[in-house]
From Swiss-Prot:
Belongs to the UPF0113 family. Pfam families: pre-PUA_NIP7, UPF0113. It comes from Archaeoglobus fulgidus (strain ATCC 49558 / DSM 4304 / JCM 9628 / NBRC 100126 / VC-16). PROSITE patterns: PUA. The lineage of its organism: Archaea, Methanobacteriati, Methanobacteriota, Archaeoglobi, Archaeoglobales. This is UPF0113 protein AF_0058. SMART domains: PUA. GO terms for molecular function: RNA binding. Residues 87-161 form the PUA domain. InterPro entries: NIP7_N, PUA, PUA-like_sf, PUA_sf, UPF0113_PUA. It comes from the Archaea.
Amino acid sequence: MAFRQPNTKELKVIRKALSYYGSGDFLSHYALLVKEGEKKEVYGVSKELYGVIGELNPHYAGVKIGEVGRRFRFSLEGTFWLLRNSRNRVWVNERGEMLFLYGRDIFAGSVERASEFGENSIVFVCNRFDDVLGIGRSRHSSDELSNLPEDKVFVENLVDRGEYLRHQKTYLSF
């Protein structure tokens, strides 16, 4: 599959997602390429590399930042690279971090703080250093956190950075 530039509709969807998460300036520093196959994978490459990709026709180039369709879905690499604001984030303590990286869900007692989001929202799970550990789905709104018992699941693990070691789930889970 060859790389191509995103079409107008795809670019609009990608720009909207980048802007929502505070990375609107990403496109001024990097170029986007779409690799169409079973899914439309979006890759970010440097402007210098972008100039020679057409001549090389590589199988892979740059960093996969997500997939585009009716909406843009960040990849784990994309979240680490692109998220610049605190929107839809949950910060966990060390124990919560360890359990999440082992594939477990986040319990209310492991959450140190959370930005504002609703129930069933896609959230980005972070450690105390602001590293994105993975992507989850909230079972409750952030407003309900203080009223939940510590042993209640607050965020369901969809995919995490420990995934490549376990090989149990696929990245298609979200």
